[in-house]
Each structure stands twice: as structure tokens, then as C-alpha cells.
Swiss-Prot record:
GO molecular function: aspartic-type endopeptidase activity
InterPro entries xrefs: Peptidase_A8
Name of the top EC class for this enzyme: hydrolase
Assigned EC number: 3.4.23.36
Annotated organism of origin: Desulfotalea psychrophila (strain LSv54 / DSM 12343)
Pathway(s) the chain acts in: Protein modification; lipoprotein biosynthesis (signal peptide cleavage)
GO biological process: proteolysis
Record family assignment: Belongs to the peptidase A8 family.
Membrane topology, record value: Multi-pass membrane protein
Domain of life: Bacteria
Keyword rRNA-binding listed: no
The protein, known as: Lipoprotein signal peptidase
Length: 165
């Protein structure tokens, strides 16, 4: 894999981490825990909540000292596995790499929170009427965008290969 290609991967990972951590620091310095500020009425708020669980607060209610280490182990394993996999990609799979970099950057952003605070800082609250999507952050958004981009490019690559046969 060319250095420039993998350098792009590292750059995207770092950009995601910086954006994630800067937005979280802003929330931590400008909001009280559970404070809500309306941004777009009946659609979007900024909030300050903490998530001791995984995505959508899964396992947040499990009272075990091992839960923290479990999340760290899974997160680090995913980061290492995806980085090794990315290193094996051919350069024509650039958008696959971008998707994986977004996933890894998001995972590292949330891992930084877990190590620093023991929980993940969430602050984006999207809702319609009384239905609120669970609060999330820039790292979570990057992970979702990365998954969608990677899956889309994989499907398109599969269709391209079928047409060539």
C-alpha cells in the first residue's frame, strides 16, 4: 500500500478524532449535565448527557466493573482489526478506505472518552414530536457515515464485478 494512501487514512482518522473531541470539550465547558438548548424547534437540540453503555446505551444498566474493560477491549480490537484490514486494501478502493477511516476515527473518539471520563459524552438530540432518537455525538455520526459508505462501495464493487463477468 502506498504511503500517501495510508497517510490519507491516518489524516481522516485524526480529523474525525479532532472534530469529535473539540465538540465534546465545547459541550463540557458550556453545558451543565442534562442541560438542553433548542436549536431547531421540534427537531434538534443540543444536550449534555453521558453514556456508560455502548451504542444506544446498551449494557449501561449492567453493574459490573468489567463492563468498562469489555468496551475498551472491543473498541481497541475493532480499531486494530480495521486498520490492519485497511492496510491490505488496494488503492482503487479509496472510498472503502475513507469509510473505514471514519469508523476507526469515531471508535477512537469514543474510546478517548471512556479512558478519560469512564463514559461517552453525547450531545446531539434529534427528535420529531415526542419521539427522541438516542443522543449521539460526532464520533457516532462518523461511524454511521463510515458504515454506510463502506457498505455502499462494497455493493457497487460487487455489481461492477458481476457486470464484467
Amino acid at each position: 500500500m502506498p504511503i500517501l494512501y495510508f497517510g490519507s487514512y491516518i489524516l481522516i482518522v485524526c480529523l474525525v478524532i479532532v472534530c469529535d473531541q473539540l465538540t465534546k470539550l465545547w459541550i463540557l465547558h458550556n453545558f451543565q449535565l442534562y442541560e438542553v438548548r433548542e436549536v431547531i424547534p421540534d427537531f434538534f437540540n443540543l444536550v449534555y448527557v453521558v453514556n456508560t453503555g455502548a451504542a444506544f446505551s446498551m449494557l449501561a444498566d449492567v453493574d459490573s466493573p468489567w463492563r468498562h474493560y469489555f468496551f475498551l477491549f472491543i473498541g481497541l480490537g475493532a480499531v486494530l482489526g480495521l486498520t490492519v484490514y485497511t492496510y491490505t486494501l488496494r488503492k482503487e478502493h479509496f472510498l472503502h478506505m475513507v469509510g473505514l477511516a471514519c469508523i476507526v476515527g469515531g471508535a477512537l473518539g469514543n474510546l478517548i472518552d471512556r479512558v478519560s471520563y469512564g463514559y461517552v459524552v453525547d450531545f446531539l438530540d434529534v427528535y420529531v414530536g415526542g419521539y427522541h432518537w438516542p443522543a449521539f455525538n460526532v464520533a457516532d455520526s462518523a461511524i454511521c457515515v463510515g458504515v454506510v459508505l463502506y457498505m455502499t462501495m462494497t455493493l457497487l464493487a460487487g455489481n461492477k464485478e458481476k457486470k464484467q463477468k
